[in-house]
Amino acid sequence: MRFGESDELDAIAALQTDGFYEPVMGTRGGLTAVDGPLRAYFESDVASTLKKKYAYAKLGRFAPLVMEDENGALIGVIEVSVQRDSEVMRAMRTIEGLTVTDEYAYLSCMCVESTRRRSGIATTLIRAGESIAKEWGFNLTMLHVYENNRGAMEAYERNGFATLDRPWRTPMDVVKNQQKILMAKRI
C-alpha cells in the first residue's frame, strides 16, 4: 500500500473506470456500439478529475492510495480527501458525542481489480484510508455507496461502517433506480 504518484493517475483512472463504468444496457445487457466512446469519455473524465484533485495532495487534503500486485500492476485504489458538504454535516449532527467541525474525512472511489475481489484487498484499502484520516486529525470517516452495490456495502459493514443517512436521489439516480447511502465510522 502506498501513495499514488502523479505519473500513475491515468493507470488509477483506468482501474476506476473498470470498476465504475456501467454499459448503456446495464451489466447484463452487453455492450452496444456507443459503449466504446462513452467508456473512453468516462475514463478521460475520471483522469481529468483525478488530476485536479491531485493538486490538493501537497496540502494534505487528498491522498490516492494504491495497492500493487507482485508484478507492480495496480490492483486496488481508494481516495481519501477532506470534504465539506452541508447534507453530510447535517447527518453528522445525529452522531451522539461527536464534535462536528466544518470538515470531515471522506473515502471514495475505492475499487479492486475484478479478479482480486473478495481477497481482503478492500479491507486493506479501507484501513489505509482510515490511517491517513487519523494522520490528518479526524476521528470519523464518511463515504457514499450505492445500495445495490452489495459487495461494497458488505465490505464497508464488515469494516465497521454503519448507515447514517439516505440522501436525496439525483435525477440520474431516479432514472437508474438506485439509492446512495451515506455511511460513517469512528476511527
Where are these regions (language model features)?
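Active-site acidic-Proline motif in GNAT/NAT acetyltransferases
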Residues: E113-T115, S119, E147-N148
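Short hydrophobic/aromatic beta-strand element in the GNAT-like acyltransferase core
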Residues: F62-V66, V77, C109, M142, ...
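Conserved acyl-donor/pantetheine-binding loop and adjacent beta-alpha core of acyl/acetyltransferases
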Residues: N71-A73, E79-C109, P171-D173
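Active-site rim helix/loop that mediates acceptor-substrate recognition in acyltransferases
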Residues: F20-P64, D69-E70, L74
